[in-house]
């Protein structure tokens, strides 16, 4: 149903759920819902982990403290196994990426009509609640990682070392500089693009499947019953998807930053 109460066609229903609440036009379009949920979940993550950290005890920990300690130890172990340099920033960065991306992905577990319906009561016509189904968000995350790759590459290797890496690899000959530069530039640029598109594609597809299943509820009793079964099955499978995508984004970030710290 639209916020105005008008019945939507299946095509209109899908389009309605895939349209962001936005202001502005063209390049200067701001997706208000994506910004709200991504920033809000980021603040929630910081508050939650800071609160648990301040209340942490050496005695018998509570369930929440145990859960968060388990996440921290898991991420710390992943960093130690993958990152071969020395940088105290990498582990906190990896933890932030993993938990933040997971929380944004987890919004996909909320039934597709609940929050848009509630927003419609307040006069908000469109609301996308999963930030990682917005290409602007995934590219922003990937761009942040890309900036860190360039920064640490120059910091560790120096400007001359970074330039040599781009121009003298894989073929160590001056005559091959144009070829090397082309190959290395494509490889470098492909890193943030693949990070962004992989996360976006998987979550967008998952959201679209939830929307298609939700359409079945408005058909007939048999399709509604089938929709319940399909939604439950996809919900269980999607828990694995959203966790795996957060893990992959984190691990690739660690790998790329580890490569940036390798001084050839």
From Swiss-Prot:
Q: Which InterPro entries match?
A: ATP_syn_F0_a_bact/chloroplast, ATP_synth_F0_asu, ATP_synth_F0_asu_AS, F0_ATP_A_sf
Mode of membrane association: Multi-pass membrane protein
Major place of localization? membrane
Q: What is this protein called?
A: ATP synthase subunit a
PANTHER family registered for this protein in UniProt: ATP SYNTHASE SUBUNIT A, CHLOROPLASTIC (PTHR42823:SF3)
Where, per UniProt, does this protein localize? Answer: Cell inner membrane
Example of a GO cellular component annotation carried by this entry: plasma membrane
State the family named in the UniProt similarity comment for this chain.
Belongs to the ATPase A chain family.
